[in-house]
């Protein structure tokens, strides 16, 4: 199955079911197809752990922060720094509308997360990843997933 077809099928399934959740193994397949395994030294398990601790695999999650900014999507990407929600000032370092981070095809969120991880702090940009994933054995995140 081609990369584009798999992403299309996963996003179609989510849209048809009006679901905002993606399964752990479906997400692992998409992340692998987008070459995140080993990206900047992080494993697929790191990415899965990040998505779980930030959003519980909820693609459409939006969270308001105490400073008035919002976090969007699977990776809870912040509107003050990374995306523009047109509600308050944003540096918009990913050059993306925050609403695009809620898209079931996941690509806008993945591309922005890759940009964030490419910076000096890597996944340490996410407090929840530091608290719950960093330095821990994460092999179980891929248990039962059939990857290519």
From Swiss-Prot:
Note the CDD domains from the entry.
LYZ_C
Taxonomic superkingdom: Eukaryota
Catalysed reaction equations from the record:
Hydrolysis of (1->4)-beta-linkages between N-acetylmuramic acid and N-acetyl-D-glucosamine residues in a peptidoglycan and between N-acetyl-D-glucosamine residues in chitodextrins
Q: Which residues form the signal peptide?
A: 1-19
Q: Name one Pfam family in it.
A: Lys
Q: Name one GO cellular component term.
A: sperm plasma membrane
- Which keywords has UniProt assigned to this entry? Antimicrobial, Bacteriolytic enzyme, Cell projection, Cilium, Disulfide bond, Fertilization, Flagellum, Glycosidase, Hydrolase, Secreted, Signal
Q: Which GO terms describe its biological process?
A: defense response to bacterium; fertilization; fusion of sperm to egg plasma membrane involved in single fertilization; killing of cells of another organism
**InterPro entries attached to this UniProt entry:** Glyco_hydro_22, Glyco_hydro_22_CS, Glyco_hydro_22_lys, Lysozyme-like_dom_sf
Gene Ontology molecular-function annotations: lysozyme activity
Provide the disulphide bond pattern.
25-145, 49-133, 83-98, 94-112
Q: Which PANTHER family match?
A: LYSOZYME C, LYSOZYME-LIKE PROTEIN 6
Describe the task this protein carries out: May be involved sperm-egg plasma membrane adhesion and fusion during fertilization. Exhibits bacteriolytic activity in vitro against Micrococcus luteus and Staphylococcus aureus. Shows weak bacteriolytic activity against Gram-positive bacteria at physiological pH. Bacteriolytic activity is pH-dependent, with a maximum at around pH 5.6.
Which protein, by its recorded name, is this? Lysozyme-like protein 6
């Amino acid at each position: 199955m081609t990369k584009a077809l798999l992403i299309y099928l996963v996003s179609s399934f989510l849209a048809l079911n009006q679901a905002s959740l993606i399964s752990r193994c479906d997400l692992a397949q998409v992340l692998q197809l987008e070459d995140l395994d080993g990206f900047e030294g992080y494993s697929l398990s790191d990415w899965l752990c990040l998505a779980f601790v930030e959003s519980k695999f909820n693609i459409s999650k939006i969270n308001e922060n105490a400073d008035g900014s919002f976090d969007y999507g699977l990776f809870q990407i912040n509107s003050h720094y990374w995306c523009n929600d047109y509600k308050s000032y944003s540096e918009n370092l990913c050059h993306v509308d925050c609403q695009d981070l809620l898209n079931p095809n996941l690509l806008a969120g993945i591309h922005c997360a890759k940009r964030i991880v490419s910076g000096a702090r890597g996944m340490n940009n996410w407090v929840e990843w530091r608290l719950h994933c960093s330095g821990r054995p994460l092999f179980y995140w891929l248990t039962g997933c059939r990857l290519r």
